[in-house]
């Protein structure tokens, strides 16, 4: 996967525009952090997030919603700036009512208890597995001991590798960004130009310290440098104060290495999440949102690690222990505890990951804890029915069970490919990603595409019902003679009743507890059917001529052409100057940082968005002097706004 490092970081005076691109122009385009003075964002309405939620990591994507009066728009084109008048709503990228609510969120006791519960689930799952493996060894059952311990080691090592790799990327990128920010403004009030990243030739008078690039799973990950606008001297002072010494960096590296060697990386991330949440409550208003979003990002990371561990360790462990129970026709207490802990861990990981994804996106409404509990019950009962069916069938047909698993995985992978998920750079990388998701589909539903999921949910669970019925029927017809109907019939009843209960909880979630549903849906004051219907511009902007638009666009085109000739690629930086402010009755604009992303939002499901948004987090958290969190604007939002501004100007 060829990734081009074309990233720049420029810090100028508050009257100029600073922008930071995503370091993969071949795939993801650019990320631009616009300087203060731009209008604040307005709205986006919710839709179903892929993966049960939305991005993990700091990103918010959005649609244009013009429901909040006086909110202002994002960086407009043609010099209009997309400013909303007092009577109309601003066309922007994130719903103002939703976004302001996110900024006012605070770390609560329930958040802390939820994370502690996740730690308890993790210890119960891994602890019972290790305890059972030791019990098998002491009883001389070496084959079962080896299989049980193998799945524990496989899941733990995989999680530690991913966790340490993310630490290396985050730590190295943070050091590079702080060093660049510290050296960018040697004197107060001086113009600063700092370029961070490798790639094309550096411009005149620009320094280019390289930043490591991280690529994980089947996604392209890019390093992001960020700029602080309007506060040159203070920003440089704070950045230089945060620059770590060599001894401090060595101690951090040593500590993290020991933590991950001892297989405690996931536990450390859980407690680090709690620490960041407590810091967000104890910090001032300017630092509160920064620590809060760091906590959200960290929890998204550890939730993804938990999800990875469950499908590498808990799911096969659960099937293995149930097969042993069926073959031996006996149930030990420790085996029952191990199976129950693995089942709870699977359901918890899916529900917790969806909550983390929705919490990390500012265009999505967060899921309430009651909704998460309903989702947990949904996955708990459907996965329970699935693994019990697998255990019954595998106890009689070991070879055919393996063939069935491979065949089901192939069908699910082909179906996912047919859904046309779009994330990876090449078609073959996309297919590899779909193959990984196909493993999850063996046990449970996992949304991989944004939009309505009703039809796909119906197809998936209808296929699962047919498979469970066929496997259970074959087991009942060919079961061992010593298995009486007194055991077989209750087992079949448990399978189908558990599946039916899970489907009922799923319907309850979508009917009553989904953030877009009737109970927690948008209020009438924030619901916008048609963004264009509510889009209005101030009189002085609406009466501007097409000539001014053409002039401004010609300036941008010349600048983009210069970058294109220098870099030898299509320009990815499209920074549009805002309209000059004139004395009028226009309400004052709220100073805000806007990160523009040259991507279409709806093409990036939540599972894949986690990888992309881990790159965005550095741009978001680098606005150390910003009084409020920066807003993200995606490519489709800009297109809608440009069309509306063009039609209004005409």
Curated annotation (Swiss-Prot):
Residues 1-15 have a biased composition (Basic and acidic residues). The keyword Phosphoprotein applies. It comes from the Eukaryota. The keyword tRNA-binding does not apply. GO terms for cellular component: plasma membrane. Residues 216-238 have a biased composition (Low complexity). Residues 21-31 have a biased composition (Polar residues). The chain crosses the membrane at residues 114-134, 144-164, 248-268, 306-326, 331-351, 365-385, 396-418, 428-448, 457-477, 487-507. Belongs to the XK family. This is XK-related protein 4. It comes from Homo sapiens (Human).
């Amino acid at each position: 996967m060829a990734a081009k490092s074309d990233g720049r970081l420029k810090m100028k005076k508050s009257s100029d525009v600073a922008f930071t691109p995503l370091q993969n122009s071949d795939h993801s385009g650019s990320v631009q952090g616009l300087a203060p003075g731009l209008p604040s964002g307005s709205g986006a309405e919710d839709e179903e997030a892929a993966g049960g939620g939305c991005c993990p990591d700091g990103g918010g994507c959005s649609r244009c919603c013009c429901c909040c009066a006086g909110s202002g728009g994002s960086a407009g084109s043609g010099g209009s700036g997309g400013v909303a008048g007092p009577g109309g709503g601003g066309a922007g990228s994130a719903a103002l009512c939703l976004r302001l609510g996110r900024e006012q969120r605070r770390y609560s006791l329930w958040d802390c208890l939820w994370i502690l519960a996740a730690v308890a689930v993790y210890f119960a799952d891994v602890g019972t597995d290790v305890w059972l493996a030791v019990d098998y060894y002491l009883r001389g059952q070496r084959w079962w001991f080896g299989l049980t311990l193998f799945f524990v080691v496989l899941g733990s090592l995989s999680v530690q590798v991913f966790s340490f790799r993310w630490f290396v990327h985050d730590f190295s990128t943070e050091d590079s960004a702080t060093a660049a920010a510290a050296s960018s403004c040697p004197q107060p009030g001086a113009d600063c130009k700092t370029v961070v990243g490798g790639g094309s030739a550096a411009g005149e008078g620009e320094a280019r310290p390289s930043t490591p690039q991280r690529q994980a799973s089947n996604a392209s990950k890019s390093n992001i440098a960020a700029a602080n606008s309007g506060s040159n001297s203070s920003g440089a002072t704070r950045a230089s104060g945060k620059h770590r010494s060599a001894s401090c960096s060595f101690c951090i590296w040593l500590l993290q290495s020991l933590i991950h060697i001892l297989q405690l990386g996931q536990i450390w991330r859980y407690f680090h999440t709690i620490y960041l949440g407590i810091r967000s409550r104890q910090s001032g208003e300017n630092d509160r949102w920064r620590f809060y979003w760091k906590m959200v990002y960290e929890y998204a990371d550890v939730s993804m690690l938990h999800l990875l561990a469950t499908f590498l360790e808990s799911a096969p462990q659960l099937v293995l222990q149930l097969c042993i129970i069926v073959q031996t026709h006996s149930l030990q207490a420790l085996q029952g505890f191990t199976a129950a802990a693995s089942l709870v861990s699977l359901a918890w990981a899916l529900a917790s990951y969806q909550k983390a994804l929705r919490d990390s996106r500012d265009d999505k409404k967060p899921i309430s804890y009651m909704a998460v509990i309903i989702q947990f019950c949904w996955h708990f009962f459907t996965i329970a029915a699935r693994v019990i069916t697998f255990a019954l069938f595998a106890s009689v047909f070991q070879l055919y069970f393996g063939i069935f698993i491979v065949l089901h995985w192939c069908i699910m992978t082909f179906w996912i490919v047919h859904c046309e998920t779009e994330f990876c750079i090449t078609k073959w990388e996309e297919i590899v990603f779909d193959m990984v998701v196909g493993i999850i589909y063996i046990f449970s539903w996992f949304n991989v595409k944004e939009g309505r999921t009703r039809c796909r949910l119906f197809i998936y669970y209808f296929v699962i019902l047919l498979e469970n019925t066929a496997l259970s029927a074959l087991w009942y017809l060919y079961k061992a003679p010593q298995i009486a109907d007194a055991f077989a019939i209750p087992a079949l009843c448990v399978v189908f009743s558990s599946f039916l209960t899970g489907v009922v909880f799923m319907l309850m979630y979508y009917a009553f507890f989904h953030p877009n549903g009737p109970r927690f849906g948008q209020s009438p004051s924030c619901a916008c059917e048609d963004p264009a219907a509510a889009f209005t511009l101030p009189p002085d902007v609406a009466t501007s001529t097409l000539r001014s638009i053409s002039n401004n666009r010609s300036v941008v085109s010349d600048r983009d052409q210069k970058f294109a000739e220098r870099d030898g690629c299509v320009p990815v930086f499209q920074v549009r100057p805002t309209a000059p402010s004139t004395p009028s009755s226009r309400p004052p604009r709220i100073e805000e940082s806007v990160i523009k992303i040259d991507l279409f939002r709806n093409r990036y499901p939540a599972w894949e968005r986690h990888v992309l948004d881990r790159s965005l987090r550095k741009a978001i958290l680098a606005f150390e002097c910003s009084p409020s969190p920066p807003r993200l604007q995606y490519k489709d939002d800009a297109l809608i706004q440009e069309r509306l501004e063009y039609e209004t100007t005409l």
